[in-house]
C-alpha cells in the first residue's frame, strides 16, 4: 500500500508540474534544471529527487536537481531568477520562508518574481532532543533553558524554524543559542553529533533518525497522525503553529504556455 501511495503521489505531482508543459510544442528540447536551495538529504532534496526520477519516464529530457544551499535560500532563488526565463529552470521554494526573506534582509527579488506551479507537501515543525537527553517534556526543556544557554540547530536564520524558536523563547522568557545548518536534515545531524542540545526541524526527520531522537512538541493545531504520542506545543502551554508548504515555482516571466 505504501508503494502504491508513493507512486500515486509522484504521478500526481508530475501531472501538476509538467502536464501542460508536455503539451507545449517541442517542449522540452533540453534538460530541465530544478534548483533546491537546501543541502542534500533534507526534506526538499529527497522529494525533488523522487519527482525528478519519476519524470524521466514521461519526459524526453531529464530533470536535473541542483543543490544551492546556504544564505537562507536567497542564493538559490536568485540563481533561478537570473537564468533565462524560458521554462527550463525551476526552483523549489518553502512558504512562508521565501516570502519573509525580502523583509528580513536585502534580496534582489520579491515574492512577485516567482510563479508557483504546484504545492508539493506540508511539513510540520517538531522540537527534537537526543534520546539520551534529560528532558522528556517541553516544560522540562524550557526549565532547563532558564538555567543554561541551550544550543538549538535549525536550517536558517529568518526561516520558519527560527521564527518559531524565537516565539517559543519569548513566551518562556529564555534565550537560545542558534546554530544554523544547510537543511532540516543538517540541523538534526548537528543535534545527533552533540553540537547542540535541541533542533527545530521537520516531521520526516523523526523517521530518518528516529532511533536517536526524542520529540518533545509538535507545532501544529492538533497532534500529528505520524507522531500521535507527541503532544502539541499548544497542549503544553504555547500556542505556536509552524508548518512549511513546499512548492515548485518558476520565473514569472516564463512563457505563458509553460505557466498555464
Predicted features along the sequence, with ranges:
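Positively charged n-region of N-terminal signal peptides that target proteins for export
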Residues: 1-4, 235
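Bacterial N-terminal signal peptides
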Residues: 8-20
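Short, solvent-exposed coil/turn elements at secondary-structure transition points
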Residues: 10, 69-71, 96, 120-123, ...
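N-terminal (or domain-start) structured segment
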Residues: 24-113, 149, 160-161, 170-200, ...
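Structural signature of the Rossmann-like NAD(P)-dependent dehydrogenase/reductase core
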Residues: 33, 67, 151-154, 214-219
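Hinge/capping helix and adjacent helix->loop/strand transition within the periplasmic-binding protein
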Residues: 55, 79-88, 102-186, 235-238, ...
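Short secondary-structure boundary segments
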Residues: 94-95, 131, 202-204, 220, ...
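Anionic-ligand binding region
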Residues: 186-241
Amino acid at each position: 500500500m505504501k508503494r502504491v501511495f508513493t507512486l500515486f503521489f509522484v504521478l500526481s505531482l508530475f501531472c501538476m508540474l509538467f502536464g501542460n508543459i508536455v503539451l507545449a510544442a517541442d517542449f522540452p528540447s533540453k534538460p530541465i534544471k530544478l534548483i533546491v536551495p537546501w543541502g542534500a538529504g533534507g526534506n526538499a532534496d529527497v522529494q525533488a529527487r523522487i519527482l525528478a526520477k519519476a519524470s524521466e519516464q514521461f519526459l524526453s529530457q531529464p530533470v536535473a536537481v541542483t543543490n544551492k544551499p546556504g544564505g537562507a535560500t536567497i542564493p538559490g532563488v536568485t540563481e533561478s531568477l537570473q537564468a533565462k526565463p524560458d521554462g527550463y529552470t525551476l526552483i523549489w521554494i518553502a512558504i512562508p520562508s521565501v516570502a519573509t526573506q525580502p523583509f528580513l534582509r536585502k534580496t534582489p527579488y520579491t515574492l512577485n518574481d516567482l510563479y508557483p506551479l504546484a504545492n508539493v507537501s506540508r511539513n510540520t515543525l517538531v522540537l527534537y532532543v537526543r534520546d539520551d537527553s534529560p528532558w522528556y517534556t517541553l516544560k522540562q526543556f524550557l526549565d532547563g533553558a532558564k538555567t543554561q544557554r541551550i544550543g538549538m540547530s535549525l536550517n536558517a536564520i529568518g526561516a520558519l524554524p527560527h521564527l518559531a524558536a524565537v516565539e517559543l523563547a519569548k513566551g518562556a522568557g529564555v534565550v537560545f543559542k542558534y546554530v544554523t545548518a544547510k537543511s532540516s536534515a543538517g540541523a538534526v545531524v548537528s543535534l545527533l553529533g552533540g553540537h547542540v542540545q535541541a533542533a527545530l526541524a521537520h516531521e520526516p526527520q523523526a523517521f530518518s533518525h528516529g532511533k536517536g531522537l526524542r520529540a518533545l512538541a509538535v507545532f501544529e493545531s492538533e497532534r500529528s497522525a505520524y507522531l500521535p504520542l507527541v503532544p502539541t506545543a499548544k497542549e503544553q502551554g504555547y500556542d505556536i503553529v509552524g508548518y512549511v508548504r513546499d512548492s515548485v515555482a518558476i520565473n514569472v516571466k516564463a512563457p505563458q504556455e509553460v505557466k498555464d
